[in-house]
A protein has these predicted regions:
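Hydrophobic transmembrane alpha-helices of multi-pass, membrane-embedded glycosylation machinery
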Residues: 49-52, 214-215, 240, 251-263
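Perimembrane helix-loop-helix junctions
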Residues: 60-64, 251-277
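Membrane-interface transmembrane helices that cradle and orient dolichyl/undecaprenyl
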Residues: 206, 211-231
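Hydrophobic alpha-helical membrane-interfacial segments at the cytosolic entry of transmembrane helices
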Residues: 68-80, 264-284
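Membrane-interface alpha helices of multi-pass inner-membrane proteins
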Residues: 29-33, 230-246, 252-257, 275-281
Length: 284
């Protein structure tokens, strides 16, 4: 639990705990799929253990003067949750996502699925995570997974705007929010670059948010010319691996990370080569 009290660029890591939990779930399902389908009681129990971390609050961190910000976060999540009322399936859900998840649920890893249907090769970690959130014929929990990323995105912007002491970050958060408002009145009704709430079976925005957070932390470190702490290195590397497992394009973030660690690259590589390289190779 001590790690959750850490701050990277003054941003409380505890606010990213839902992402950490989903990353853990994805890795457990991915590894276990070499031996069994994910529709297995043992996989469920092991995968859902970290959810308890999301209810952890260190008492001395809670301050009543911040109750307004806490309520704003809760209100943001509630408003986003209203999307569940009218959400529909994306065409990719029927095309390959749900079928891929069904294979993950019922079978051990099936090699060469892309030879059967090329779009099976487009699956990502989202399908491994989503495979344990089926509820009979109701797929609303898959939509909730998308809402986790959207909620984290807005919680991050609220932090930058109202809690950060940096004028630059306040302006960045305000600029992103202002762009989102303007995009609602763009060509053909907007959605010309800003994130939106994905329909069920799509995870483009999940990757976009992971990529945004990853490169925010990297750029902030580069801007301040700060030495990268080992724990911050692991957090950034975790975000990079998570984004790569959603979209291979996430590897671009390694360029910025390499600039951060260029002076002590051997030390950092020795720290990361076993856990992250192992998970990366399993994913490939």
């Amino acid at each position: 639990m001590g790690l959750l009290n850490h701050k990277i660029q003054k941003f409380p890591l505890v606010l990213l705990s839902p992402l950490i939990s989903l990353f853990y779930v994805g890795q457990i399902v991915l590894i276990s799929n070499f031996f069994t389908g994910s529709d297995n009681i043992a996989v469920y129990i092991i995968s859902l253990l970290p959810i308890t971390a999301n209810f952890y609050i260190e008492k001395n961190k809670f301050k009543f003067e911040k109750i307004g910000i806490i309520l704003l976060r809760v209100l943001t999540i509630i408003i986003i949750g209203f999307s569940s009322n009218t959400i529909t399936f994306h065409q990719d859900a029927a095309s390959y996502h749900l079928n891929t998840q069904l294979f993950i649920r019922t079978e051990k890893v099936v090699l060469g699925l892309a030879n059967v249907y090329v779009r099976y090769g487009y699956s990502s970690l989202s399908d491994y995570i989503g495979s344990i959130f089926w509820n009979d014929n109701n797929f609303i929990y898959l939509h909730f997974l998308n809402l986790v990323f959207i909620s984290i995105f807005y919680i991050f912007l609220i932090w930058g705007l109202l809690e950060s002491s940096s004028f630059r970050l306040k302006m960045m958060s305000l600029g992103v929010l202002f762009f989102g408002i303007l995009d609602n009145f763009g060509i053909e009704g907007g959605r010309n670059g800003y994130i939106d709430i994905d329909t069920i079976g799509k995870q483009d925005n999940a990757f976009a948010i992971l990529f945004f957070l990853t490169n925010f932390f990297i750029i902030e470190k580069l801007y301040k010319r700060e030495k990268l702490k080992k724990v911050d290195f692991f957090i950034i590397l975790f975000l990079i691996l998570f984004s790569v497992e959603y979209r291979f394009f996430g590897l671009v973030s390694l360029i910025g990370l390499s600039l951060l660690i260029k002076d002590n690259i051997k030390d950092y590589i020795q720290l990361s080569i076993i856990p992250f390289l192992s998970l990366g190779l399993i994913w490939v």
